[in-house]
Amino acid sequence: MEIQMSDIYCEGDLYSNDDSVTIYMTPATPLTYENNKWVYHQMPDVSQFKEDMRRQQVLHADNGVLAHLKFEFPENVKPNADMMQLLRAEGFQVGNLELYMIEATDLRQLTGPSLEIEPVTLENMADYMHVYEPLSIQFGADYIKESAQALLTHLKKASRALQPYIAYENAQPVGIMNMIETERTVELDGFAVAEEARGRGVGSRMQAFVGEMARERPVILVADAEDTAKDMYMKQGYTFVSFQYSALKELTVSVPH
């Protein structure tokens, strides 16, 4: 089975899609960069990217998305020297996400402490946020508030592709994760273990649960190429599939129309 970055789920609202670029625009979550981005299918040249910067800035401003610009480049294509020079000159942070996969049978071999892992509901949403908030406060109180509202809205949907889960140990919330199930794959996203619960195999036991849910489907995830988390995934048996460069510019002033 061929796995690609296009198999990775995006919670953002699809604004437009053509052979060149897919645009996600989600005014309800303006501080969630992942939900407001342009994904290139063909690598733009420098002049095209300059024009797209201007177009994205206007589109974002028209929709109340004032904090950033974000672009993702085609899978397995590194921006050339001219593009990298432009990105740095324009104040973009250049990132590199890596796609990993593992067979569900391998995940099921992981061990850890006894946990109760439950889907997030309106009734236990506060437990999810109890783990989420300390790990995300670095992005600001407004981001936490937006995330909580987005989760509440999401949980009220009759059907949803993404299902959040909470892991409890001795009735205390110690871990959170999102699972996106399709016929082909199960994606693991938003995976986090509370600081005080780390180093005891909680994360391994949570992933074993994902392996159980996946049955025969491969499990996929993305990790930052510079993040130490990817080393953990590789030790657990995940294999590298592909990479994708991105460019993020955080804006500190209001965007003019």
Stretches found by the model and what they are:
Residues E2-S6, M43, D106-A148, P256-H257:
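Short amphipathic alpha-helix that is part of the acyltransferase structural core
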Residues F49-E116, A247-K249:
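Acyl-donor-binding surface of acyltransferase catalytic domains
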Residues K78-V94, S204, E226-F243:
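Conserved active-site alpha-helix within GNAT-family acetyltransferase domains
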